[in-house]
């Protein structure tokens, strides 16, 4: 028998989440963001469930090629563009749309020998200060690209740094408008947060990521609780040991939890080597036999401890939901001082994954 931990992926939830994105951005087309191996869910496992998308957006050539080999014939957007000039041969072969954000990429495109022009997403730095041209350079760069035989359709893109806030995109939108002055261009601006909360930024293409997988771009589940979005991933395990503590006894490495009274705890087959956050403190929510309770003590490599006071019926073999439909990944992440994105992406290879 295998160790009882597993991650299950609800593909119907994934389909529903894409449908909700379309309802939120009715006039825009959708790039479904599947970077980081579909946020830890596995591109090969999930892509066909959202095959009704208009396009896929990601980073790695290997993942783009996987989509082509699995039969996806629609658009693929490479969000960070090509990393080396020689990559353009592969972009040409697989008909990939590339982001352009740096001067050297302009030169590489100019000098490349392509069989057909590539579609381009010109990135403007609207305040995130990661990638992209400054707004006052965009018109010049646009004209340079437009004059190249290797360039096909062009779209202006940017990425919001604070779209989870009600007034969080106003400054960025002003910079984008400055960049787009004098251009008649398609635009792709909205990440997950802007897709949900800033319809004025939808334009031609939205780029939802985390919301497709049923977690909140703000890191707070309550912000999306009424949207109909559903968690796709459930991480579950079982109790493999039970201890009855006396008052004053401590639990785990460093003895960071001390029982105030006699207390039963369950030892769960899950730890930080599985992707559960090591920094999750005592009190992190967990579901035992359908009853909400909490972790106690320090998370170990392969195990963690939970309070069985609310569920005295629990024992060896009792099911445990670490995150999923009832215990939201955002809540676990918040307790651990991180975000749901990180927990999804950190799911360890040793954890078996099933689709339902």
Swiss-Prot record:
What triggers or suppresses the expression of this protein? By alanine.
Q: Which cofactor does it need?
A: pyridoxal 5'-phosphate
Modified residue annotations for N6-(pyridoxal phosphate)lysine: 35
Please state what class of enzyme this protein is: isomerase
Q: Please provide, in alphabetical order, the Gene Ontology terms of the cellular component aspect for this entry.
A: cytosol
Q: Which SMART domains match?
A: Ala_racemase_C
What processes in GO biological process is this protein linked to? D-alanine biosynthetic process; L-alanine oxidation to pyruvate via D-alanine
Gene Ontology molecular-function annotations: alanine racemase activity; protein homodimerization activity; pyridoxal phosphate binding
Residues of the active site are: 35, 253
Q: Which reaction does it catalyse?
A: L-alanine = D-alanine
Function field: Isomerizes L-alanine to D-alanine which is then oxidized to pyruvate by DadA.
Its family?
Belongs to the alanine racemase family.
Name this protein carries in UniProt: Alanine racemase, catabolic
Gene designation per UniProt: dadX
């Amino acid at each position: 028998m295998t160790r009882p931990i597993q991650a299950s992926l609800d593909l119907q939830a994934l389909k529903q989440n894409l449908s909700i994105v379309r309802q939120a951005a009715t006039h825009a087309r959708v790039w479904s963001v599947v970077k980081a191996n579909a946020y830890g869910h596995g591109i090969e496992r999930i892509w066909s469930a959202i095959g009704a998308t208009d396009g896929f957006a990601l980073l790695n050539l290997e993942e783009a090629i996987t989509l082509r080999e699995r039969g996806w014939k629609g658009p693929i957007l490479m969000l960070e563009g090509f990393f080396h000039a020689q990559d353009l041969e592969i972009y040409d072969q697989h008909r990939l749309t590339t982001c352009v954000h740096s001067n050297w990429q302009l030169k590489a495109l100019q000098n490349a020998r392509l069989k057909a022009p590539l579609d381009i997403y010109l990135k403007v730095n609207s305040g995130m200060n990661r990638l992209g041209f400054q707004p006052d350079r965009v018109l010049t760069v646009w004209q340079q690209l437009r004059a190249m035989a290797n360039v096909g359709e062009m779209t202006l893109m940017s990425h919001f740094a604070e779209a989870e806030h009600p007034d969080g995109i106003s400054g960025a939108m002003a910079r984008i408008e400055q960049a787009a002055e004098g251009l008649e261009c398609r635009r792709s601006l909205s990440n997950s947060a802007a897709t949900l909360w800033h319809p004025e930024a939808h334009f031609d293409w939205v780029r939802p990521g985390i919301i497709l997988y049923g977690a909140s771009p703000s890191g707070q589940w309550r912000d999306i609780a009424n949207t109909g979005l559903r968690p796709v991933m459930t991480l579950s395990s079982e109790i493999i040991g039970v201890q009855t503590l006396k008052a004053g006894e401590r639990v785990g490495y460093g003895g960071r939890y001390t029982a105030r009274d006699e207390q039963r705890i369950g030892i769960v087959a899950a730890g930080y080597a599985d992707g559960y956050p090591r920094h999750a403190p005592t009190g992190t929510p967990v579901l035992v036999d359908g009853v909400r309770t909490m972790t106690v003590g320090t998370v170990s490599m392969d195990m963690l401890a939970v309070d069985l006071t609310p569920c005295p019926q629990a024992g060896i073999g009792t099911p445990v939901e670490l995150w999923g439909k009832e215990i939201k990944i955002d809540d676990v992440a918040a307790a651990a001082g991180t975000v749901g994105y990180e927990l999804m992406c950190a799911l360890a290879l040793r954890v078996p994954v099933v689709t339902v």
